Structure formats: C-alpha cells, structure tokens
C-alpha cells in the first residue's frame, strides 16, 4: 500500500475576510484602551480614599475622567458649525474652547468634537473660565453653573444678584454679589463648591469689576471701583486665600480695562490712560 503525503489546502483570504479581520483587531484595540482607562480611574479612586484627600481628589478625578473621555473621542476635524449664531464670548480651556451665545453655550475640542452643550435661557449670560472648568452665570439673576469640559458639576443659587465670577486653575470659584450691609460681597469657594472665605466690601473699597486668580490658585487680584471726592477711583487689591486679609496694591483715577498674571509674582493691568502698569 502506498501512502501519499497530503498537503493542507492553502487558504485564500478574500478582500472581505481581510477587512473583517482588521475591524476585529480595531475592536480589540478599543477594548484594551477602555480597560486601561477604567483601571486608571479605579486606581485614582483607591489612592484618593487611601490618602484621605477625598475632596480635592474627587475634583481631580473628574478632570481626569474628562481628559480620558476627550482623548477617546474620534477627531471630527474642521470646519464645524458650532450652532452659536451670534458669539458673545469665547474662552480657552485645556484641550478645548467654550463659545457663549445669547441662549446657549457650547464646548468643542481642539480636534472638532462637540463635548458639551448648555441651553441656559439667561437674560445676561457671561462666562468665567479656568483651566479645565468654567462658570456660566446670569448677570441679572442669581444662578450660576459650574461646568467641566463635558458635563455639569454644580448649580448654585446665590442669595443676592450676581455681578462677577472668576475661576482658578485648580477649580476654585470666586463670586461677587450685591450685599445689604455693604456695597458688595466677594465669596471664594473650593473646587467642591464649599465656601472658603468671604469679604464684604465697603463703599470706600468699591465694587469689583475685574478678578483674576494667580497661576498657583492661592491668590486673587481684585480691581474694585468707587468714588472719592467726586472722582472715580479704581482700587487694586491682592487677596491671599490662606489669610483672607486683602492688601491694597494700587489706587488710580482710571478704570482697569484688563489684568492678567504674567508669572506667579507679576500682575499686569491696562487702563485708558498711559498709566498702564505692573505690580508684583
């Protein structure tokens, strides 16, 4: 009896078969990415509770969730119709930007993906932005919304009408409202919206028109307007958040139109006259 060696038949992969295998590999890669992201979030939560830094760590964990969610979204590309017909304000966040219109605001990633959409219905909407979150508030009302890049974090109603808001890089929020006993009240909240300090401004100190947190989120620059001997005066204060006692840095007979921190110790401000300046 003769034995013949049998060769296994060669498998011819059709184009459809190749495409199917490639799609399967892509699904596997996406599952691995999701499992890795879930593991990172779980480890972050374990570390937060193990170290006892729950309050601060929860805020950081929410920012981490946002960053992972944004990274996993497909790149939509540009141009895009953002749905804001009349732009009132534009602010930059980490990896994205937020646009404010008359009736709504929208957040888009730098790669063209829509991340968040808020229909506010506020009569006089305004934005204040930090690094990874922003505040949408009503300047003729008493409601504000703290938003991350992808979702609502907190909604707060103040006792008196809102004048101004500011957001620190680490998520702290400062608000200026009307006040019965004084001309205004400035309140600073932690990233979890727990009140940290308050300052009742007198008529001599003025009403804040500009606020800017320092890069380290530990100090707040405040430009407040008042009247002295029939003249308009702007007082520039520095408020250390760990002490709560405002320090008067400068006083001038002009509005401060803009101010910002050039570094951790240098604050730049501009006014209509040639007396623009910097202080440290």
What are the language-model segments listed below?
Residues 1-32:
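N-terminal Lys/Arg-rich, disordered targeting/topogenic segments
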Residues 36-51:
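Hydrophobic membrane-insertion alpha-helices, especially the h-region
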Residues 72-81, 113-118, 151-157, 195-201, ...:
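A short beta-strand motif characteristic of beta-propeller blades
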Residues 75-103, 119-127:
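Beta-strand-rich domains and repeat architectures in extracellular enzymes and scaffolds
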Residues 84-89, 122-129, 160-167, 206-212, ...:
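Repeated scaffold domains used in trafficking and secretory/extracellular systems
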Residues 97, 134, 173-174, 220, ...:
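Hydrophobic beta-strand positions that form the internal "hydrophobic ladder"
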Residues 143-145, 182-187, 229-237, 275:
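Structural motif
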Residues 269-278:
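Conserved small/polar residues in nucleotide/adenosyl-binding loops
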């Amino acid at each position: 009896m003769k034995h013949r060696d049998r060769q296994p038949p060669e498998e011819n992969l059709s184009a459809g078969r190749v495409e199917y295998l490639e799609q399967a590999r892509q699904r596997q890669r996406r599952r691995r990415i999701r499992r890795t992201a879930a593991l990172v979030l779980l480890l972050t939560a374990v570390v937060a509770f193990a170290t006892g830094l729950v309050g601060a760590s929860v805020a950081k964990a929410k920012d981490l969730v946002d960053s992972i969610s944004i990274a996993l979204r497909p790149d939509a590309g540009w141009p895009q119709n953002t749905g804001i017909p009349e732009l009132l304000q534009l602010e930059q966040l980490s990896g994205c930007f937020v646009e404010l219109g008359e009736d709504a605001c929208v957040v888009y990633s730098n790669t063209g993906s829509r991340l968040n959409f808020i229909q506010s219905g506020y009569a006089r909407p305004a934005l204040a932005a930090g690094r990874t979150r922003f505040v949408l508030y009503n300047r003729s009302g008493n409601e504000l919304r703290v938003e991350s890049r992808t979702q609502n974090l907190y909604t707060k109603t103040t006792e008196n009408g809102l004048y101004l808001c500011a957001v620190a890089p680490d998520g702290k929020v400062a608000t200026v409202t009307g006040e019965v006993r004084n001309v205004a009240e400035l309140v600073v909240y932690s990233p979890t919206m727990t009140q940290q300090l308050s300052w009742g401004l007198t008529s001599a100190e003025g009403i804040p028109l500009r606020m800017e947190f320092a890069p380290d989120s530990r100090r707040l620059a405040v430009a407040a307007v008042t009247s002295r001997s029939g003249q308009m005066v702007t007082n520039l204060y520095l408020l250390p958040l760990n002490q709560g006692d405002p320090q008067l840095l400068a006083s001038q007979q002009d509005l401060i139109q803009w101010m910002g921190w050039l570094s951790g110790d240098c604050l730049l401000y501009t006014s209509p006259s040639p007396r623009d300046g910097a202080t440290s």
